[in-house]
């Protein structure tokens, strides 16, 4: 993995799992299994109500706290929403936007995802912007056409200085929560394509510096092969991030230089 120009990020997405009371024992077990030295940045994205507990428990392991979604609005009469300033106030350093589950179950479109990413950047939170194709789109050979459109839409109006604080996560929708995984070659091909799209917008240097993660059933068994690919700079981990030993194993897999 080439770490010369960009950081490696291993981020967990706990989705609607775990309790705040379970975070401390989780972190204690994680610490026991982590390597003494590591070059990657670790993030755990929890439901918003659990972020303060993650901030507190994560300090010892140097795990950053992240959110799973954010409102495009700064404040107001938006019942149930959480703003970027509220996330920042409780210690979130990262936040996922555009996850396929948000797109599917909540009807989120690219314009909304772009607005959310901008809201996060304004408050100093790094957005993890998810893009990816369905099985139908892959079978129709439309993967890069669709993913390129998502990338361009998500980054619309974001300048090169802001791009440096963005992370892109490629999530083949057909591999989310299904146990199916894109081959390392398939994942690399799309991540390389994403970097090419960014290069076309911002130029070679900014594109070279963007961290691109793979999000599609990465686990302790396949992480090393996926993370060895030149354009995969980490992972956005679902189920495996709920298991301290497995998450630590994925972190160890980043040390391949």
Task: Identify the residue ranges that each predicted region occupies.
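Active-site loop-to-helix "anion-binding N-cap" substructures in soluble metabolic enzymes
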Residues: 1-257
